[in-house]
From Swiss-Prot:
Belongs to the UPF0324 family. This is UPF0324 membrane protein lp_2841. It comes from Lactiplantibacillus plantarum (strain ATCC BAA-793 / NCIMB 8826 / WCFS1) (Lactobacillus plantarum). The keyword Nucleotide-binding does not apply. It holds the Pfam family Cons_hypoth698. The keyword Ubl conjugation does not apply. Keywords: Cell membrane, Membrane, Transmembrane, Transmembrane helix. It comes from the Bacteria. Its main location: membrane.
Amino acid sequence: MKVKGILPGLVTSLVIAIISQGLAQFVPALGAATIAILLGIIGGNTFLKQPQLGRGTKFAESKLLEYSVMLLGATMTVQTIGKIGGFGVLFILCQMTITIVGALWLGRKLGFSQSVRMLMAGGNAVCGSSAIASIAPVIDADEDDKGTVITLVNLMGTVLMLTLPVLGMAVFGGSVILKGALIGGTLQSVGQVVAAASMINQTTVQFATIFKIMRIMMLVVVVLIFGRLHQRTIENELAEDAVVSGNGNGHWLPWYVAGFLILCALNSLISLPAIIGATAHTISSWFEIIALAAIGLRLNLVNFMKAGKRLALYGLGVGTIQVVSALILITLLLQH
């Protein structure tokens, strides 16, 4: 009975993901992930707004995104860090710190909850949907907040994906390393990084991917820090005898983030066969797109539009902080 209850929503999400992959061949600038979430939003708020899809879309949104995060670990190694050098690592660490602090500060100014601020900070600083899915359980974020931030981060990422290649060529000219740093150090998802860098050339793709992987490898650190910050907030509220939600389970590291870390360590130590990394990447990408379709199906467009102006300001503000800080840091640390 449980499988039967899940199937309608799961199959619907899969069909949207397949259609999105097909459409992405004709509109590569958008990418399958963005198309999936947009088609999901359209369907979920019109003819696919059916309660029988709820269990399946919830499963796809949560579980498939978790498996996607874990499988990412098999696609990277610690040795990657050496390819961008000490200043490259310093650039990524500074860029991520500025993004997180900036997103938390701006979110507070705009009146967003702590969970939305943390999801926005982690999603933009690390790796989009995967980071948001990893952070959500350790800060007890509800499904609505998670879906809203994932949608916002993906839409903002699409805008940056189309503009950063032009900006990179205008500012850094022929330097593929600097353009790769701008794209890989700023864009949210791996797919967006590859798509944006491909608009320049294949060498830029390679450098941009290395900078992006460095950010992904910081996922565990960000999850642990945010988990600790949330735990401290709960402790402060308890100390003040406030009413605290009982959702917290005290786990700072979700199982799939631990799995990500184990697979990354394993690949670093024994170098897994290329076929395993390629297969893990393909499955991870498909799981993410199916999950994004489900998130779109579950997103209440009316509620999303109610906060539309604030959300747009938040997304635009965080995106601006990222781009400006990246340009300054690249000039100071990498341009010589």
